[in-house]
Every structure is written in C-alpha cells, then in structure tokens.
Amino acid sequence: LAGDGLGKADLTCLENLLKEDPSNKFLSTVLARENQHELCVLARKFPNLMIFGCWWFVNNPSIVEEITRERIELLGLGMIPQHSDARVMDQLIYKWAHSRQIITSILVEKYSILLDSGWKINESEIERDVEKLLSNNFTHFLSS
C-alpha cells in the first residue's frame, strides 16, 4: 500500500514541498518515533501542514500516548490526534476505543495543570477544544 514503509524518514522532502507551495495543504503522519518531534516543528513552521493520527504500525496504546502527548505539548490543539487508517472494521473499533481514552487522559492532565495555576475553565471551553481536536481542525484546515 502507498506510504507503508519502515524506518526513519527524511522529512526534508516534506519541508521542501511545504516551503515551495504554501498554497497546497498537506496532511501528514510518520511512522518512526524519531520523526515525531521534527514533524511537530514543521507543523509549527508551516501553516499548510496538518499532523493527523498515528500510523497503523505505531498503534500501541503506549506509543499513541507518547506521540499524542508530544504533539499537544508542541502544537497545543493545532493537530488531529487520531484518524482511521483501519483496513477492516474491527481495527477501527478497538483503535478508537483506546485512542479516546488516551486523548481524554492527556486533556484531563493538561486542564488540571491550568486549574492548579489559577486558570478558570468552563464546560463550553472544554467542548470547544474537543470539537477542534476531533472535527473542526480538519474542516478549518481545508477551508483556510
């Protein structure tokens, strides 16, 4: 299948595409742990890049948590935490179940840090943030 591969990627090619054609929009995810930070930096530098989901082969809960946490810490809500690249329905069901738990856990931790610092958070702000992560980021990215 297109895009299935192993090992660390050279993201220079992606960086060149982003730089040379800022009017084109790119959705990207990478396989190697070693590429995750570099991909986040590219997403901060180039508004025409949206990071989305975790590649099928890194779909272990501990790795999904690590990647999602890193992306939220570097990009805030400016990414799509999970997508379906499931090839059969039963993969989709279990993938979403553990991804949802991970996203929830990370958001609860981040909101707790804000509350501990004296920041006031209301239910509508949490709903807004979740809608961004699970729906609106994608729609906004394509329409901007």
PLM regions: where:
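Short acidic/histidine-rich active-site segments
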Residues: L27-L31, F52-C54, L75-W96
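His/Asp/Glu-enriched short active-site or ligand-binding loop at hydrolase and phosphoryl-transfer sites
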Residues: M50-P61
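Mid-to-C-terminal alpha-helical segments outside catalytic/metal-binding sites
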Residues: L77-G78, Y94-S144
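Residue-level preference for long, well-ordered alpha-helices that form the structural scaffold
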Residues: L6, N60, E123-E127
